[in-house]
C-alpha cells in the first residue's frame, strides 16, 4: 500500500513540474523615453576678479550668478488599457512592442514547444507505468 502512495506522490510531482515548466514568464517592461533631452548647463560668464587694492563700497550688494537646475519631474507613464478580466489590453500605439504572447500556431517555435510537451508527457506516462507494474 505504501508503494502506491509513493507512486501517486511522484505522479502529482510530475504534474506540478509540468505546470510550472509551461507557465508563461512575466512580460518585459519597456521604460518610456524622455520627451525632451536633458538640458545641458550653459557656460557661465566669469566676472573679472577685483584687484586686491580696490575694495567695493560696503553698500554695494554682492550677487551670485543664477544657476539653472535641470527639471526633476519624470515624464508621466503612458496609460494602459485593461480588459474587464484585468489582462492587459491589445490596443498598443504604433511604434511600441505589444504584450508578450505565447507562440502562434503557425510559428516554428510553436511546433518545438508542442514536441517538447509531447515528449515530456510520454516520458511521464512511461515512468508511472513502470512504477505501477
UniProtKB/Swiss-Prot annotation:
Lipoprotein as UniProt keyword: yes
Q: In which tissues is it expressed?
A: Expressed at a low level in flowers and siliques.
Residues recorded as bearing Pyrrolidone carboxylic acid in the entry: 22
Q: Which residues form the propeptide?
A: 110-133
PTM text: O-glycosylated on the hydroxyproline residues.
Q: Which keywords accompany this UniProt record?
A: Cell membrane, Glycoprotein, GPI-anchor, Lipoprotein, Membrane, Proteoglycan, Pyrrolidone carboxylic acid, Signal
**What's a GO cellular component annotated to this UniProt protein?**
side of membrane
Q: Tell me the membrane topology, using the record's own terms.
A: Lipid-anchor; GPI-anchor
- UniProt KW Nucleus keyword: no
Give the Pro residues compositional bias ranges. Answer: 25-37, 49-81
Q: Could you say which residues form the signal peptide?
A: 1-21
Residue ranges of the region described as Disordered: 23-110
Composition bias (Low complexity) maps to: 38-48
Record-stated family: Belongs to the classical AGP family.
The free-text function statement in the UniProt record for this protein reads: Proteoglycan that seems to be implicated in diverse developmental roles such as differentiation, cell-cell recognition, embryogenesis and programmed cell death.
Q: Provide the protein name.
A: Classical arabinogalactan protein 5
**Name of the encoding gene:** AGP5
